[in-house]
Amino acid sequence: MATSIMNQLLNLWAAIEIIVPIDHSCGRDKIVQITDTIGVMLTLKYGSKIFSDLYKSMKLWDKHTLNHFISKVPVEYGNDLERFIAFVVLSEYEPDRKDLYNLLNDFPLLRYRIYSINKKFSTPKSIHDTMSNHMRKLSWHIRRIYRTRNSMVHNLSDALF
């Protein structure tokens, strides 16, 4: 099983090196270029994934109640997901969110997710901070994968010679 995990990690890194274009003439390390490219790609989708996952969780909790609160947001905001996002982040819906929080007393994790996402995405500064924090964590994970891959490759080459 350990060999399988090692192979998966090596294959993942090989795929990353193939997919991400590396500019050898720019003077930046390969890992920096890979981290920057992948980090930006994954960070661009982060916000939509957060809201989409919360929306799905709310639909599973109580679709009719969710629709009741979404209906308070004008249709000009867009589709149901976009109206849900407006409901979660805009200050004008704070009284309605408090009503929703009361209905979620038996579901504290779901209630906290809404509260937390509201705090992370309600102002330009909080959005910037949230996205920057996500990008930094992605960078750490990518570098961790890179270090592990290098360790495996070097340990394997030491064992062979």
Model-derived segments and their meaning:
Residues 1-161:
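Amphipathic, oligomerization/interface secondary-structure segments
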